[in-house]
Amino acid sequence: MKKTIQRGLFTGALVLMTAMTAKPANAEVNYQALVDADVKAFQGFFRKEFPDVKLEDFGNGVYALDEDARKQWKEMEEFPPYELDVEAGKALFNKPFANGKSLASCFPNGGAVRGMYPYFDEKRKEVVTLEMAINECRVANGEKPYAWEKGDIARVSAYIASISRGQKVDVKVKSKAAYDAYMKGKKFFYAKRGQLNMSCSGCHMEYAGRHLRAEIISPALGHTTHFPVFRSKWGEIGTLHRRYAGCSNNIGAKPFAPQSEEYRDLEFFQTVMSNGLKYNGPASRK
């Protein structure tokens, strides 16, 4: 009980950290420095709570915390349930559109671009996610967009993630507009909502590593590195925003639309918090 209270106090302090950072009058604000301070505190929290876990292992979720669960997961990864989805995603990525182009025409580096997303588009003044870029490519070439949460969008995303494994998370926040989006995502992460009056941080910081019913709560650090995921509960592969919607439903809150500004800003914040880790998707989860 005492440790839970201490965790709660610490997460509350993280919420206030940026607002309390002194900014010299009339001086140009170094937004990246403010964000880097958040990252240091956020990652420091988890490294203190789980001193035996290497930083890079947080991308493996609960399997970094529980040895029995890790063994079961490794056995499952020997014959990954998402393997066929990756193959299907590759075919879709290279399939010609009616105009002769393809998704491959829109992405550099042969499609190994997971490390480029999400990013803040300074011209459009909004966060752009990988799934958003996939559908924008299709629409720009006269094709219909994929449905957002599962199916072909998740398969293409899984293929791109698979050929991008090992790329380092390094999301930049350079401007006031980018910082505003980051702060919206941060506020979403720490805000309580729904019938259960819970927050993302309440589950995945204060209760990280503990059991809720029969499940172990995953740590927030590394949450975005391994998506899309094949969840046993779903019986299929799905996107990060599908998982966000599921979390909202679990606490009795109305989900936002997939790829809404709210969820894109949340993804932006969460990915920034994982700066320094490596992308390791797609992955399998319960």
Swiss-Prot record:
pH-dependence annotation = Optimum pH is 6.0-6.5.
UniProt key word Cell membrane: no
Q: Does the keyword Signal apply?
A: yes
Q: Alphabetically, which GO biological process terms does the record hold? A: sulfur oxidation
- Catalysis performed (reactions): L-cysteinyl-[SoxY protein] + thiosulfate + 2 Fe(III)-[cytochrome c] = S-sulfosulfanyl-L-cysteinyl-[SoxY protein] + 2 Fe(II)-[cytochrome c] + 2 H(+); S-sulfanyl-L-cysteinyl-[SoxY protein] + thiosulfate + 2 Fe(III)-[cytochrome c] = S-(2-sulfodisulfanyl)-L-cysteinyl-[SoxY protein] + 2 Fe(II)-[cytochrome c] + 2 H(+)
Residues annotated as binding substrate: R243
Which residues does UniProt assign to the signal peptide? 1-27
**Where along the chain is the active site annotated?**
C247 (cysteine persulfide intermediate)
Q: Show the GO cellular component annotation of the record.
A: cytochrome complex; periplasmic space
Q: How is the cofactor bound?
A: Binds 1 heme group per subunit.
Cysteine pairs bridged by disulfides in the record: C106-C137
* Record-listed heme binding positions: C200, H204, C247
InterPro entries found in the cross-reference section: Cyt_c-like_dom, Cyt_c-like_dom_sf, SoxA
Q: Which cofactor does it need?
A: heme
Q: What EC number is given for this enzyme?
A: 2.8.5.2
Name any one Pfam family assigned in the record.
SoxA-TsdA_cyt-c
* Domain Cytochrome c: residue ranges: 180-286
Its PTM note reads: Cysteine persulfide at Cys-247.
Keywords of this entry: Disulfide bond, Electron transport, Heme, Iron, Metal-binding, Periplasm, Signal, Transferase, Transport
Q: Which family does it belong to?
A: Belongs to the SoxA family.
Q: How is this protein organized at the quaternary level?
A: Heterodimer of SoxA and SoxX. The SoxAX complex interacts with CT1020, SoxAX-binding protein SaxB (SoxK); this interaction seems to be between SoxA and CT1020 and stimulates catalytic activity of the SoxAX complex.
Name of this chain's protein: L-cysteine S-thiosulfotransferase subunit SoxA
* Source organism (scientific name): Chlorobaculum tepidum (strain ATCC 49652 / DSM 12025 / NBRC 103806 / TLS)
